[in-house]
Design a protein with these regions (language model features):
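Accessory beta-strand-rich segments of carbohydrate-active enzymes
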Residues: 53-55, 62, 76-79, 107-184
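Recognizes extended acidic, P/S/T-rich segments that occur
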Residues: 14-53, 63, 67
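Structural beta-strand segments of beta-rich domains
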Residues: 2-6, 118-120
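Aromatic/hydrophobic beta-strand junction motif of beta-rich domains
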Residues: 6-10, 124
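Surface-exposed coil/turn segments at beta-strand junctions on protein surfaces, enriched
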Residues: 34-38, 47-51, 100-102, 115, ...
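Extracellular fibronectin type III
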Residues: 65-75
């Protein structure tokens, strides 16, 4: 069980809110109506499944009017991440070599799909900055992804839905690695 942090903004004074979460049209969480102007909340001890799509629904009351909103979200990988690090295994011979200019590294994977998938997610992380492309289109709107963390304590990964980028037949995924703090 994990906490969920939810935030929203309201263009007028908020009097109350009510949150619900659905999976496949089934309600998996329904909170009580809360009289509050809070717009950042923590929901503790949710029993959500890993790598699963949900819809968060919110009902906001403001000046006796009711507003509705919803947002899709996907839970991440729970527990130990079993991915494999990709590296060129170059070792630094001298520390000053770390600061030399280098071209960005490109990682490429070609594969074929017999049909376009209904869902396709990628979980990706870089120890430094990266951009992700599928079939020549940049995935997401962020530039130079990856949040900095103390890598000995934890590493954040990003999740992208690739369904709209993939095609039946030949596909190409490539990642451009930035010349950053994990240069070698």
């Amino acid at each position: 069980k994990f906490p969920l942090i939810i935030s929203w903004s309201c263009n007028s004074r908020q009097d109350s809110y009510q949150i619900s979460i659905e999976k496949d049209s089934d309600i998996v969480y329904k909170g009580e109506k809360v009289v509050s102007s809070d717009s950042i909340i923590f929901i503790e001890n949710l029993n959500l499944e890993a790598e699963t799509n949900y819809i968060l629904k919110i009902e906001i009351t403001s000046n006796s009017k009711v507003f509705y909103g919803d947002k899709k979200f996907r839970t991440g990988i729970f527990g130990e991440f079993l991915g494999k690090w990709i590296s060129d295994d170059r070792k630094l011979e001298k520390e000053e070599d770390y600061y030399k200019e280098r071209r960005n590294t490109i990682l490429r994977k070609d594969f074929e799909l017999k049909e376009t998938p209904k869902e396709a997610f990628i979980y990706i992380v870089g120890l430094g900055y990266y951009n992700l492309y599928v079939n020549g289109k940049k995935v997401g709107n962020a530039e130079l992804n990856t949040d900095w963390t103390n890598y000995s304590k934890g590493i954040f990964y990003d999740t992208y839905n690739l369904q709209e980028y993939l095609v039946q037949g030949e596909n190409i995924v490539f990642v451009e690695l930035g010349n950053g703090w994990y240069n070698p």
